[in-house]
Amino acid sequence: SYITNHDQNFNESKKTLTQKYGDNRYPLTVLAYTVYGMPLIYNGQETGGNQALDYFNDTKINWNTQDEKMLNTLRTLFALKHAVSALSDARQSSDNPTTTLLNVSDNTSVLAYTRTLDDSQVLVVLNMGTTATSATVEGITAGEWSLWLDSETIAQGTSRKQTTLNATHTFNLDAKGYRVYVSGTYPEQNVNQHTAIRSIRSSQQDDGRWYTLTGQPILRPTKRGLYIHHGKKIMINQ
């Protein structure tokens, strides 16, 4: 699934994500990465996707123009896609996670659904409307959830917040807002570091250390959560 590709970016009259979707580009990105299938990211999309690339000529991506909201949204979605089995893609379609659309009471602007595989579950709530809204969602698995992606704070950096959701729960969402929850209990993480795209030399060697998602080196994980080790995202459940 994707919201842009090389043909659309080069051939269509509305080439960039902003031209095509406006602020819908944010919740649509979350939708593409969580509803089903394997998502595709096009060149430079993590900078905001607002550059038209000529694939017949050597057009350089402008890495100096960054959309922190899009960058941090994609960083979080990448990590969750790699580490949470409810967002995985199996070799056989019969083994894929189940996508369940949830009922949203009296609000046609909000889409809510879960992805479930065994005891792993992800809840996604998207506001496609142009104004902030309150939406009551039914059919949620009541209990402890961890908020991994929040449109209201993601531009400032990645974070994680623990919360309890009821089977019928009311969410307050900003315009074009989105939330992604993972079932279970994880340590909270505050937004505490500016994030940016950095160049990495191809000759740079793997130092074997563990890193948090904000890039902080640690000796070893001591809490549940997502970490980076040997270039891979690893979820620690203990």
What spans do the regions from the language model cover?
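Residue-level detector of functionally pivotal "anchor" positions at catalytic/ligand-binding pockets or at interdomain
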Residues: 185-210
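Glycan-recognition and catalytic regions of carbohydrate-active enzymes
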Residues: 42, 49-122, 128, 182, ...
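Terminal processing/anchoring signals of secreted or surface-associated proteins
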Residues: 77, 192-200, 215, 227
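C-terminal tail/sorting-segment detector
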Residues: 226-238
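Aromatic/acidic polysaccharide-binding cleft in carbohydrate-active enzymes
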Residues: 1-19, 28-68
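Solvent-exposed beta-hairpin/edge-strand motifs
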Residues: 139-154
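C-terminal beta-strand-rich structural cap/linker in extracellular carbohydrate-active enzymes
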Residues: 161-192
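Surface-exposed beta-strand/loop patches in extracellular or lumenal glycoproteins
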Residues: 128-143
